[in-house]
């Protein structure tokens, strides 16, 4: 995702899975319980201190300036359910299945998996999803506002292309600022700081900022008030 975020040729990031005809389709079935550690993280032997690395991915998805589209076929449950929620948009095939399973196996997500879910579908529905651990069809997910659209499996790829091409025609800076603004209230001061970062970058491109920089380099006082846009 880091490469896609920094690649100027990429306008939209698609998050999906490799569907095989020989296996039950799944977007993501959640965390691997075989490497879940008693130390509170997931330990696959690669780190001395287990930690929830998926949280790093969730934060990265939220902070990424480019739109992220989750394309779901089959199961998106547990951690996979949270993963698609952290994407900006979710487009699903008609065989998609959504839901939480954590409490069945002594697991829970007290971060985006709970807070963002409640903001998306409402308090009562979020509690139902966590407290009952039942599965929801693509149509049910669409009705509760959990996803954006459902398409027949054989039409999904083409429809995703339509969504992506439309976003690719829009201003990338406008999309980045809109994403940061939408996330800001939920992400607290970190979200507000990210939105402020976009504003700072845009300010650096202004005539006022250029005048300030050039005046400093030339050893003179800046003449901000002579710039037409300086109205404050």
List PLM regions with ranges:
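Short hydrophobic/charged patches on amphipathic alpha-helices used for structural packing
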Residues: 1-2, 58, 81, 201
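Glycine- (often His-adjacent) and acidic-residue-rich active-site loop
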Residues: 2, 9, 16-63, 76, ...
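C-terminal long alpha-helix characteristic of the crotonase
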Residues: 2-5, 91-96, 138, 147-195, ...
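Acidic-histidine catalytic/liganding microenvironments
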Residues: 7, 64-65, 144, 206, ...
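Conserved hydrophobic packing residues within short motifs/helices of P-loop NTPase cores
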Residues: 13-15, 69
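Crotonase-fold acyl-CoA enzyme core
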Residues: 59-175
